[in-house]
Amino acid sequence: MMDNMQCGYYNSGSPYNFPSVLGPGAAIGPGPVPLGYCKEPCPTRSLCDPSYIGACGIQPLINPFGPRRAVTTWKINYLVSNRTNQAAHTDPDLINPWGIAIFGNQLWIANGQTDTITNYDLFGNKLLGSITVRNIAQNSSYPTGIAINCTGNFATTNGTLTKSGLFLTCSEHGTVHSYNPQVDPLVSFLVLNEQLTGEIHVFRGLAVAGDVLYLADFFQSKIMVFDSNYNRLLGFPFVDGDTSDPIPISYGPTNIVNIGCYLYVVYARKDPNVPLQAITGAGFGYISIFNLDGTFVRRFTSRGVLNDPWAIIPAPVECGFPPGSLLVSNHGDGRINAFDCNGRYVGPMLNQSGLPVIIDGLRGLAPHYTDFNEIFFTAEVDENIDGLVGSICKDQVIYF
């Protein structure tokens, strides 16, 4: 059984002092999601309960009209690339990486272009051989999101041996794969194939909460929900209820992230010519918050600095971010922006020159749970031709 620190913020209270946000009386609702899902008791309603918009005490990272203040800066370390001389290590299978997870002080990366999961230590040294993620009936699966499974369910099998999957990955070909090295150290087996329905499904992100699997279907513009035996569950609406600022029909969910007792759904704008793909642009993006039963809580943030957003992680308060803040990666402009617990923009992560950190093709983010000073990332470079894994480390403090 994995402990909370290993499972991270996806399946329990966060080690980042990010408060559990389910207030008294705010039941998760009907359906198979257990009321005792949060491993830590949810406290009384806090200012960072997403259903309560209060005075979080927002403090922009840079305020030209305020007093001088200390700001933490960050530096980029390039750990692994598919190209030589681009990073400390080279791995030809690291092409078009998306999701990233940290488990057992190791990095696990889903690579879309090579249909693999690659595994490294925190310095970028490759550990296992590349893990195949492929549907035998197809030439490719194109894995995107990856999630740690802490439940003991969501089985994977090689036909002889069956175990709970350690990781689940989803793909842009509408499939889900489950991996356990005891079943096969180099194969992640197909466990769900929605292409068999005859419809097009493009899964760009996934989340596991209790014994429920949530999939962000970008093409169908919906969240699909399954139980731990991969049976479809209905009755989870996932309808954005912000009538004052409705999400246009040209958008679809590109990722879903479980933080505390809530699900954050990230929306990207579809390419009108190729609706399986997203397009980038300033203000292209929405993020909304839902209960685990799919009922709408509130809009977190809209447009503004969003530019084809994808990953969301808790921001480390130890590095000067307001309590309950979140960091959001932009694939479009390569920035990592901070938002307070009410969804108000705080500012970008900065380099030592006081300028925004920019990572070309930025996609996934994963904080190092035992070290608040480091965040790992994935990036797809040169239009899916190349890939990069790196870390962003706390650098020096500067004053504005």
Swiss-Prot record:
It is found in: Virion. SUPFAM superfamilies: NHL repeat. InterPro entries: APMV_L690, WD40/YVTN_repeat-like_dom_sf. One of its GO terms (cellular component) is virion component. Its main location: virion. The keyword Lipoprotein does not apply. Keywords: Virion. Disulfide bonds: none annotated. It comes from the Viruses. Belongs to the mimivirus R640 family. This is Uncharacterized protein R648.
